[in-house]
């Protein structure tokens, strides 16, 4: 495990897809309506195995509905696999939905504190990094503004800044994240390159 940041061995995941039984016209007219539901089992992932080395950028590709997002959520510990094992080295920060966990009625500063605590960051570290997060997100004039007054681009920049300032061992991205304008995207790419140089993994 020393050379790898992630080890995935024979991971499988199923979900239940529930359906409501259709009511016939006769049942509807007679008032004899019984709400019956049934489900089918969807095999989303089956016996998935791979390793991600430290400092490696690892891409997961596939068709829509092939289980890419489910796999990332398992790596994030949001879902548990039905079978198989996952081992990770160091902190893992998921950026699966930009702004996930943010509250629209809280200010940018308060959301930084809340998000960082959820990511396991100490209060001391949060205080030290808050200014850097605001500066990286280019939101100096909006630190005390509630998120409900942010544009989607502003919220995205804040979420990305929170994730990278945590400095995780593994950063999980759901699809290619286009955050902000061209200048901000260039800044994000430089961060990714620096991550890789310092032995961080990106999935």
Locate each region found by the language model:
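The feature captures the beta-strand-to-loop junction immediately N-terminal to the Walker
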Residues: 61-63
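Pre-NBD coupling/linker segments of ABC/ABC-like ATPases
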Residues: 2-47
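A short, proline-enriched helix->beta-strand linker immediately N-terminal to the Walker B motif
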Residues: 162-173, 179
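Conserved ABC ATPase "signature" region
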Residues: 26-34, 113, 125-142
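Helix-to-loop junction immediately C-terminal to a conserved catalytic motif
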Residues: 76
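Conserved ABC ATPase signature
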Residues: 146-153
């Amino acid at each position: 495990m020393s050379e790898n940041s992630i080890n995935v061995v024979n991971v499988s995941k199923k979900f239940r897809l529930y359906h409501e039984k259709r009511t016939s016209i006769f049942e509807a007219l007679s008032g004899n309506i019984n709400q019956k539901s049934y489900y089918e089992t969807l095999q989303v992932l089956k016996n998935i195995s791979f390793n991600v080395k430290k400092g490696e950028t690892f891409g997961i590709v596939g068709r829509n509905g092939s289980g890419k997002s489910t796999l990332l959520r398992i790596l994030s510990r949001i879902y548990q696999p039905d079978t198989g094992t996952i081992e990770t080295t160091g902190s893992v920060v998921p950026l699966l939905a930009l702004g996930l966990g943010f509250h629209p009625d809280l200010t940018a500063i308060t959301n930084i504190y809340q998000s960082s605590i959820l990511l396991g960051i100490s209060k001391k570290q949060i205080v030290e990094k808050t200014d850097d997060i605001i500066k990286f997100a280019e939101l100096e004039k909006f630190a005390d503004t509630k998120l409900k007054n942010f544009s989607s681009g502003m919220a995205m920049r804040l979420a990305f800044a929170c994730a990278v300032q945590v400095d995780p061992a593994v950063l999980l991205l759901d699809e290619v994240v286009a955050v902000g304008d061209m200048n901000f995207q260039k800044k994000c790419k430089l961060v990714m390159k620096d991550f890789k140089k310092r032995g961080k993994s990106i999935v």
